[in-house]
Structures are given as C-alpha cells and as structure tokens.
Curated annotation (Swiss-Prot):
Keywords: Allergen, Glycosidase, Hydrolase, Signal. It holds the Pfam family Glyco_hydro_17. Monomer. It comes from Musa acuminata (Banana). This is Glucan endo-1,3-beta-glucosidase. PROSITE patterns: GLYCOSYL_HYDROL_F17 (PS00587).
C-alpha cells in the first residue's frame, strides 16, 4: 500500500447509526495477503485461515512459490500481482512475459484458480515505471493467450484514487491529465478484453485528509441519511462516492463498460489518531462486507468485488498505521471479530 491521495468531498453534520446485522458469506469479498513481517505464519497455515474464515478470494502481491503451492486445490480465487521489480523486463521482453506466466501461472493452473493478473500496484502516474505498464500488460495478455487462458484470467493494473483529478461531485469524476495520459490507452485495452480496472479505495485517508469536510460516519458507512445529493444519485457513504467518481472518469475516456474491482480497502486499528481504532476498523470492514453486494448509486445492483487490506499486521512495514491494517495478528488470533 502506497500513500493514498485524499479526495475532497463536501462535509455535512451527521448522526451515527448502529451496526445491527451480521452478514452472511459474501462471495465478492477477498482479503489481501502481504508478507512484510518476520513473524508471520507459513503460507499453508494462512490458506487454512482463509478457508476457516470463509474468505473466498486472495490478493497476492508477488508470485511467492510457497503460497502458490499452498493454494492448490483450495478453491480460493487469486488476484496475483506482477511486482514492480518485474514490470520493466516484462514490458520490453515478450519472452520474459511468457516465462513469467509459465512459471507462476501455468505451472499451477487449474489447481490454483487465478482470477486477475495485476501489472504493478499504484505506479500511475508518478512512477518512472508508469510508461511500462501497458506494454507489460500486453505481453502478459499475449502470454496468457498462448496458454489458452486469456478468457479465464484477466490482465489489469492497480491504481489508487490519486489518479482522479476531480472527484466531487462523483458525477464530475475525471482522471488528472497526468494520469489520463497513461490510463486512456489502458482503459481501451481493458474494454477490448473485458477486464476491470483495479482501484485501491481508502475512505480512511480521505477522512483524515479532510476531517473538516468529511464526517466520520460518512466514511464508516454509518451515516443516518443522504450526505451528498449529486443530481439523481444519493450518497450515504464515501466508499460509493469514490467508486462512482472512478466510474464517471472511466466513462469520460471511453470505458463505460469497464468494471471496477476494489483491489484494496481497509481501516487501521491503531497507530494513528483516535479514528484509527479497533472499533472503527471493525465497523468499516464489516460494513464493507455487508455493502458491496448492492452496487453503487451509479451502478445499482451490480456487485462490487472488493479486497480488504489486509490479512495480518506486518511488523516490517513503516511504523504507525501501516503496521495496523490487519484482520489478524501474526499468531492467527483476530484483531477484532468480523464475519465473512
């Protein structure tokens, strides 16, 4: 997870409502599995923990061979990242892309159920690797095609909400000029191949960046009524407003039929101000699980696939909140109770 850009949303005074229901299993929810810790359980135990908690999808940030081996015959669907260290070589060398797919995907398919390949995480627009994302995506797609897997496994890239130059109101959502230079052709690639755009969505960072304009209930899905009225669209939570701003931005560059997959979203349980608490983290993530099945005001009834960030608190990340997004401690005990 990189630093998230805040989104400016006009604030309103809100009342806090109470979470009143425990969700049943939601198939559209996954959890991100990071490994930046020196005390984490082995991948085989992690996969068992996913299964015992009815977590049906996993985001894996690099093709860790022990994790892929543990995922065999687990029925867990996998979003697999191409790490930034591989992006440039895969962009410039189709043979390298073929080798990458053979080694990390074909070798495990179909006993590992790959869903997406994410070429890079939050590398657009500011990274020096941004120019290599689309060529790498094309080479990975061609490698999947050679293996006959282009219809089963979709190729995309993960961006953060900093790619939005305009986000309020949501219907005015538009990519910044810097991001659009890269994203316009990427969106055309996604549209032509039926692939979604992967977006990391963090109402937490929007709230902490604009506490005078954004209320905590709006960020936590606990607002008691409509907060933002945007023409015919009514918004009661910030998550929907952010996702719909991305949909609007996609429409502006010819991506009206491109889906959005929320490749990261979460709330820290400690390490920041008072808003970083176990109570707020539980409330946000449980409400996210409850919410995604109903779509957004701009896409009502269309389930939003989302991945909670993240499975464990990781002690080798930067201090503060970065170490405290986990649903579980490294000893596999829950940081707080949550139901999938």
């Amino acid at each position: 997870m990189a630093t998230k850009a805040s989104l400016s949303i006009k604030g309103f005074a809100l009342l806090v409502s109470v979470l009143v229901a425990v969700p049943t299993r939601v198939q559209s929810i996954g959890v991100c599995y990071g490994m930046l810790g020196n005390n984490l359980p082995p991948p085989s135990e992690v996969v068992s923990l996913y299964k015992s908690n009815n977590i049906a999808r996993m985001r894996l940030y690099d093709p860790n061979q022990a994790a892929l081996q543990a995922l065999r015959n687990s029925n867990i669907q996998v979003l697999l990242d191409v790490p930034r260290s591989d992006v440039q070589s895969l962009a410039s060398n189709p043979s390298a892309a073929g080798d990458w797919i053979r080694r990390n995907v074909v070798a495990y398919w179909p006993s590992v159920s790959f869903r997406y390949i994410a070429v890079g995480n939050e590398l657009i627009p500011g990274s020096d690797l941004a120019q290599y994302i689309l060529p790498a995506m094309r080479n990975i797609y061609n490698a999947l095609s050679s293996a006959g897997l282009q219809n089963q496994i979709k190729v995309s890239t993960a961006v953060d909400t900093g790619v939005l130059g305009t986000s309020y109101p949501p219907s005015a959502g538009a990519f910044s000029s810097a991001a659009q230079a890269y994203l316009s052709p990427i969106v055309q690639f996604l549209a032509s191949n039926g692939a979604p755009l992967l977006v990391n969505v963090y109402p937490y960072f929007s709230y902490t960046g604009n506490p005078g304009q954004i209320s905590l209930p709006y960020a936590l899905f606990t607002a008691s009524g409509v907060v933002v009225q945007d023409g015919r669209f009514s918004y009661q939570n910030l998550f929907d407003a952010i996702v719909d701003a991305v949909f609007a931005a996609l429409e502006r560059v010819g991506g009206a039929n491109v889906a959005v997959v929320v490749s990261e979203s979460g709330w820290p349980s400690a390490g920041g101000g008072a808003e970083a608490s176990t109570s707020n983290a539980r409330t946000y993530n449980q409400n996210l699980i409850r919410h995604v099945g109903g779509g957004t005001p701009r896409r009502p009834g269309k389930e939003i696939e989302a991945y909670i960030f993240e499975m464990f608190n990781e002690n080798q990340k930067a201090g503060g909140i970065e170490q405290n997004f986990g649903l579980f401690y490294p000893n596999k005990q829950p940081v707080y109770q949550i139901s999938f």
